[in-house]
């Protein structure tokens, strides 16, 4: 039984976690552009009377997330780390060959490596314009009709008996 746990731990350390991190970085390469263009999902209907407050907190989080994302102009730290790692590996792979015949055979591969290096370095050095933050107007809050004890208890205690609004 301990052998199974040891093998599982080694599998996780050697294969699972590095590949999971690499997959997350690779999958997120296109997400900042999509997040700025997509419309945010409508907040779920809350059971309390503070839906306006909840919506404003949601939009506050959306604005802070947008400003945090736009500060890096679309490429965050982990994406830059992955790109730099690939550039490093490609530069070591493109080290001068000792044999001249091996150099002639690998010319198409070197051209492909050079194109990939050029593209990756352009991704790191290119200054993209940050996407404009889409700020939604705050929802209108309806003024209370009049103060009643039953309405106050309903709001504070969460008790609801009868219609929500008087048509």
Curated annotation (Swiss-Prot):
It is found in: Cytoplasm, Cytosol; Periplasm. Residues 1-38 form the signal peptide. Pfam families: SecM. Keywords: Cytoplasm, Periplasm, Signal. It comes from the Bacteria. GO terms for cellular component: cytosol; periplasmic space. GO terms for molecular function: translation regulator activity. InterPro entries: SecM (IPR009502). Regulates secA expression by translational coupling of the secM secA operon. Translational pausing at a specific Pro residue 5 residues before the end of the protein may allow disruption of a mRNA repressor helix that normally suppresses secA translation initiation. Belongs to the SecM family. This is Secretion monitor. The lineage of its organism: Bacteria, Pseudomonadati, Pseudomonadota, Gammaproteobacteria, Enterobacterales. The gene is secM.
């Amino acid at each position: 039984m301990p052998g199974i746990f040891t093998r599982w731990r080694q599998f996780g350390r050697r294969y699972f976690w590095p590949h999971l991190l690499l997959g997350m970085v690779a999958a997120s390469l296109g997400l900042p552009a999509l997040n700025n263009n997509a419309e945010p999902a409508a907040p779920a209907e809350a059971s309390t009377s503070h839906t306006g407050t909840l919506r404003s907190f949601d939009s506050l989080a959306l604005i802070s997330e947008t400003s945090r994302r736009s500060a890096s102009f679309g490429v965050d730290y982990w994406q830059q780390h992955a790109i730099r790692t690939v550039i490093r590996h490609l530069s070591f792979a493109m080290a001068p060959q000792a044999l001249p015949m091996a150099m002639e055979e690998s010319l198409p591969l070197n051209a492909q490596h050079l194109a990939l290096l050029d593209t990756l370095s352009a991704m790191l050095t290119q200054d993209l314009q940050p996407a404009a933050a889409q700020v939604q107007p705050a929802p209108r809050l309806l003024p209370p009709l009049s103060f009643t004890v039953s309405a106050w208890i309903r709001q504070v205690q969460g008790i609801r008996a009868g219609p929500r609004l008087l048509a």
